[in-house]
Amino acid sequence: MQQRRPVRRALLSVSDKAGIVEFAQALSARGVELLSTGGTARLLAEKGLPVTEVSDYTGFPEMMDGRVKTLHPKVHGGILGRRGQDDTIMEEHQIQPIDMVVVNLYPFAQTVAREGCSLEDAVENIDIGGPTMVRSAAKNHKDVAIVVKSSDYDAIIKEIDANEGSLTLETRFDLAIKAFEHTAAYDSMIANYFGSMVPAYHGESKEAAGRFPRTLNLNFIKKQDMRYGENSHQQAAFYIEENVKEASVATATQVQGKALSYNNIADTDAALECVKEFAEPACVIVKHANPCGVAIGNSILDAYDRAYKTDPTSAFGGIIAFNRELDAETAQAIISRQFVEVIIAPSASEEALKITAAKQNVRVLTCGQWGERVPGLDFKRVNGGLLVQDRDLGMVGAEELRVVTKRQPTEQELRDALFCWKVAKFVKSNAIVYAKNNMTIGIGAGQMSRVYSAKIAGIKAADEGLEVKGSSMASDAFFPFRDGIDAAAAAGVTCVIQPGGSIRDDEVIAAADEHGIAMLFTDMRHFRH
């Protein structure tokens, strides 16, 4: 499907002017006539390029503070006119064919993201003429090329050179897809913003703007196809958000290893998000989306050694995340000790990568150093619907804890309690975590009764010969009965951290007092399903 179309006239009107001067220079040097509007036209003229203002071409001035620029038959007729079919009427009305449209849209997303953005500010950044030209050109892609991404500029010039001043239908069709994706995402952002304003805008309502729009529009970009999904009979792909600002598995760079699988990505996300909770050098080992070993240490090697000791059996074939650069010593320890699917860290030294290269199947990802955690939304698909909630970024500090028992925790118990509370947030409910000296010693995950999670954590610790006596225990939600406390006490736990809030809190606290256990209430729950 070659069907080449020569590019003789291009209309350029962009908000993001990155690369536009160089692109316009390349087009002009190849004999392409340039039409432009407003700030883009002024910029090109300042650079000495021969450019015709759209208002001069149409004979109709820009008006209403730039609200009306390109909404004119001589513009849209030139874009929508079908070559070989509409030529007579175009000639009759002095409409010149426009072969390429280069447009990106007003920065609506950036505007509404600014603190203190008013509805009036948002409205003035809703592009009208831009999307209209984009859709017109994309509709008529058989004859017209539409360019909405500056990243395409170089490839377009190369193809024009390779095809004697023309672009192929395949290229124009691909550009049209990008254009429709661009306008769909743009309109979705506007719809989401206006939808969230409904409570504050209707009638005499004094309600604040809603957190969730009445219609939720989502746009994700496909990053990769996968061999299969969670199971081999399921097809799958990985989609990511555009302009993600926080270091994540979605933004990470894979520096070695096989392509990531569906399960690799899910588990790596769980490991990375958990290790982000710690300021000290930390290591998190994950299996089936649950931490099976977590520790902080004097170095990441120390942290890895301690995390691995929690559950070496489960660590086999796991995902390992660090919050510091992967160094050669740690890489060697991992490769020598265990089979690992993925290692992710902010960065990796050259020496470390030489060591991991010996195991070509090991996937190594670098994600960059992270800063402040970015608020966002979490989604859970149910049959016929979507559950949406704020991302769980909640965490408590020592000053927010309430001691509810007769005995106060020791300094080490308190440190361990805060440590295992951070881990429990990332363990599937019902979640119980035993910790001692800033390392997990037993993790009970995903049980239907909390007492069995507590028992499993104790069994795990015993199996690995880890001393539970003097340890702290975290529970992601309250204890409905005292049995979980009794099980923990039998194992040797001396401090418990939990949300509180059960109708039997008094009974649970009394059990802790009976066993001489210090108990801390967080008043915050961390269910994870």
Swiss-Prot record:
GO molecular function list:
IMP cyclohydrolase activity; phosphoribosylaminoimidazolecarboxamide formyltransferase activity
Q: Name one GO biological process term.
A: 'de novo' IMP biosynthetic process
- Coiled-coil stretches are none
EC numbers: 2.1.2.3, 3.5.4.10
Keyword Kinase (UniProt): no
User: Which UniProt keyword terms apply here?
Assistant: Acetylation, Hydrolase, Multifunctional enzyme, Purine biosynthesis, Transferase
Residues forming the MGS-like domain are 1-148
* Reactions mediated catalytically: (6R)-10-formyltetrahydrofolate + 5-amino-1-(5-phospho-beta-D-ribosyl)imidazole-4-carboxamide = 5-formamido-1-(5-phospho-D-ribosyl)imidazole-4-carboxamide + (6S)-5,6,7,8-tetrahydrofolate; IMP + H2O = 5-formamido-1-(5-phospho-D-ribosyl)imidazole-4-carboxamide
Q: Which GO terms describe its cellular component?
A: cytosol
Pathway recorded for this protein: Purine metabolism; IMP biosynthesis via de novo pathway; 5-formamido-1-(5-phospho-D-ribosyl)imidazole-4-carboxamide from 5-amino-1-(5-phospho-D-ribosyl)imidazole-4-carboxamide (10-formyl THF route): step 1/1; Purine metabolism; IMP biosynthesis via de novo pathway; IMP from 5-formamido-1-(5-phospho-D-ribosyl)imidazole-4-carboxamide: step 1/1
Carrying N6-acetyllysine, the residues are K287
Q: Which domain of life is it from?
A: Bacteria
Q: Name one Pfam family in it.
A: AICARFT_IMPCHas
What does the comment on domains in this protein's record state?
Answer: The IMP cyclohydrolase activity resides in the N-terminal region.
**Assigned protein family:** Belongs to the PurH family.
- The name under which this protein is listed is Bifunctional purine biosynthesis protein PurH
Source species, please? Escherichia coli O1:K1 / APEC
